């Protein structure tokens, strides 16, 4: 995609796509602070940060990778997978409220659920598969680059799809997938024609969430039935807020790409114009993110948009008391099953492994196969399955 090139053994990223500085800030104790890690309020917190950093370094020696299935799976991993992250942290006496808030935030941001819900494997994977964890001032290596686009990961999927444009049949919702003796029948709803249509295929890759795949297949394999029963999905709400003018400056660090309030129910907001290279001033466009507990899925569906708009504005008000009067337009998007939550036992699920390794004419490729949801996992699942299908059909895979 032209995002990176290799020069003298180093990866050099195209700076237009790297998150511009300042990247993150946290509103705590009445002021903005650079970064999302709460500032130290005494030696007890520093000591806890350092102890957690040491535990993450230990976990890295055990082996964590992104995509996760590139790492080996040992009994130690299984032990971590069998308990919640909160339980594991309690056992380690890592209980400082500021550390726990930060770890909860990371889990809600990446997994859609807090440390009391996700497994200890997931909580450690967040750090150990990437840059580790460093107390303030202890950062050694350069941070891993963050790529971001105003349209989010839609930028990536649009460019990955571009070379295949002629082969894509969009605007169709698959209703049924039936394996026959010599092929596969698909029943799809064609949105433009307003009619159902039948397709025949030699092979099918179900790149749909596993709970959807389980409903599409007339005869889902046992592993799919089991896996679909093990998955828990987090509902999410996003809100795009178009403002009429700049917000008042609060004390501390300047506006960043990601802006979070300590203790908030939401995950804060990103500035959708942060990457803009257009020098002429334009009013802010903010995207707020909310990961809700599964118990609130029905509310998300049933409560009117005004209720959720109010919820978002109330949540952001302590950051920007002048936000509501500046609001020109708000666009809300509800995701009933936004991402699979890595609850205890899920990463080690034999059913997920079996689906990822499935042979035959119907194969599976979705981030769900990793037990949690990030772009890298979706990409890895897609590539792996594409190669297998191509091999089975005697085609070359790119
Ligand atoms: C609000 C939000 C923010 C996120 N932010 C990040 C981030 O910053 N970084 C990151 O790495 N990940 C992020 N994620 C997670 C990321 O979006 C997912 O990991 C990724 O989209 C998974 O890709 P996938 O191809 O496996 O599945 P999906 O993106 O779920 O794609 C499945 C596709 O199947 C289609 N489909 C479903 N049913 C049918 C049917 N019956 N017929 C036809 N098509 C069907 C769907 O429309 C969808 O297009 C975020 C997720 C959310 C919800």
Predicted regions and their residues:
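Polar, surface-exposed loop/tail segments
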Residues: 7-27, 173-177, 226-229, 255-262, ...
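Flavin (FAD/FMN)-binding glycine-rich loop and adjacent Rossmann-like elements that form
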Residues: 53-62, 128-132, 142-150, 234, ...
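Active-site/ligand-binding neighborhood in enzyme catalytic cores
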Residues: 64-176, 180-183, 200
């Amino acid at each position: 995609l032209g995002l990176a090139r290799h020069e003298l053994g180093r990866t050099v990223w195209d700076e237009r796509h790297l998150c511009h500085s300042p990247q993150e800030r946290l509103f705590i104790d009445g002021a903005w602070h650079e970064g999302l890690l709460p500032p130290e309020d005494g030696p007890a917190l520093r000591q806890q940060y350092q102890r957690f950093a040491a535990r993450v370094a230990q976990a890295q020696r055990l082996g964590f990778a992104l995509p996760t299935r590139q790492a080996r799976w040992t009994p130690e991993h299984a032990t971590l997978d069998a308990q919640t992250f909160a339980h594991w942290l309690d056992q380690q006496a890592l209980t400082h409220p500021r550390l726990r808030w930060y770890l909860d935030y990371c889990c809600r941001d990446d997994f859609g659920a807090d440390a009391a819900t996700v497994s200890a494997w997931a909580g450690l994977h967040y750090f150990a598969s990437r840059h580790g964890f460093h107390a303030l001032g202890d950062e050694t290596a350069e941070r891993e680059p963050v790529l971001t686009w105003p349209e989010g990961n839609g930028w990536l999927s649009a460019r990955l799809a571009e070379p295949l444009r002629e082969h894509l049949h969009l605007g169709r919702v698959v209703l049924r997938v039936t394996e026959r003796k010599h092929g596969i029948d698909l029943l799809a709803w064609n949105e433009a024609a307003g009619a159902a249509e039948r397709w025949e295929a030699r092979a099918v890759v179900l790149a749909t969430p596993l709970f959807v795949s389980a409903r599409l297949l007339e005869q889902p394999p046992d592993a799919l039935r089991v896996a679909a029963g093990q998955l828990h999905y987090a509902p999410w709400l996003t809100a795009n807020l178009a403002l009429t003018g700049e917000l008042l400056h609060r004390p501390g660090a300047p506006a960043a790409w990601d802006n979070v309030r300590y203790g908030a129910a939401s995950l804060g907001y990103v500035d959708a114009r942060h990457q803009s290279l257009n020098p002429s001033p334009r009013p802010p466009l903010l995207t707020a993110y909310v990961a809700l507990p599964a118990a609130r899925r029905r509310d998300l569906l049933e409560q009117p948009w005004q209720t959720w708009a109010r919820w978002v504005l109330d949540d952001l008000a302590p950051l920007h008391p002048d936000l509501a009067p500046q609001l020109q337009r708000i666009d809300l998007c509800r995701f009933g099953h936004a991402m699979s939550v890595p609850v205890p036992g899920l990463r080690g699920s034999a059913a997920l492994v079996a689906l990822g390794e499935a042979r035959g004419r119907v194969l599976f490729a979705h981030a769900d196969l990793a037990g949690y949801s990030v772009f890298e996992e979706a990409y890895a699942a897609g590539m792996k399955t594409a190669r297998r299908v191509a091999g089975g059909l005697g085609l070359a895979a790119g």
